[in-house]
Amino acid sequence: MMDLFKAIGLGLVVLLPLANPLTTVALFLGLAGNMNSAERNRQSYMASVYVFAIMMVAYYAGQLVMNTFGISIPGLRIAGGLIVAFIGFRMLFPQQKAHESPEAKSKSEELADEPTANIAFVPLAMPSTAGPGTIAMIISSASTVRHGGEFPDWVIMVAPPIIFLAVAVILWGCLRSSGAIMRLVGKGGIEAISRLMGFLLVCMGVQFIINGVLEIIKTYH
């Protein structure tokens, strides 16, 4: 049972900086300004469902994609590390706010014409929460844990859905409490937390690259 708790804790530590629900909160507040309370709650719930579904598909279909295209684990680690480090760097030194992204601008224009337009999948679920970095991390981590032997097989079966469900529930809670969160920490607080998470992502991405290079050296030495 301790192995299960350890796996869940490790998964949340790895995924939450990438998912970064607080950034999604800021985006949600910018896009849902004209929605009533019931519609906001519905969008919050649907965004969480979409995030859970995207993560599950990435985890279970990732190995199939790797086998189909002949992608090695070291190659995936290096590519995933580059993506994660790049996303972290952009969070450390943002060139644009979350609500100024192309996806958010496109959805804002759609909302101007149709105030009840769906914002749950794009941009809240993807790319804001379960974006390329999150998907790359999930696929890479799936390959690592399956071949690493660090956790028992039953933990590897049970832990991922629980981790993804926990991330989805955290996102849902943040979106439902978006107004209170914004009043509590403010835009400056969200920006500071995002930069801290960005630094962690840069470190994680660099470590992924190092691990991939070391594995290549070990394989071909």
Swiss-Prot record:
Top-rank taxon, per record: Bacteria
Keywords attached to this entry: Cell inner membrane, Cell membrane, Membrane, Transmembrane, Transmembrane helix
TM annotation in the entry: 8-28, 46-66, 69-89, 119-139, 155-175, 197-217
Bilayer topology term: Multi-pass membrane protein
One cellular component (GO) term of this entry: plasma membrane
Periplasmic compartment residues: 1-7, 67-68, 140-154, 218-221
Compartments in which it is found: Cell inner membrane
Cytoplasmic face of the membrane: 29-45, 90-118, 176-196
Family: Belongs to the UPF0056 (MarC) family.
Name this protein carries in UniProt: UPF0056 inner membrane protein MarC
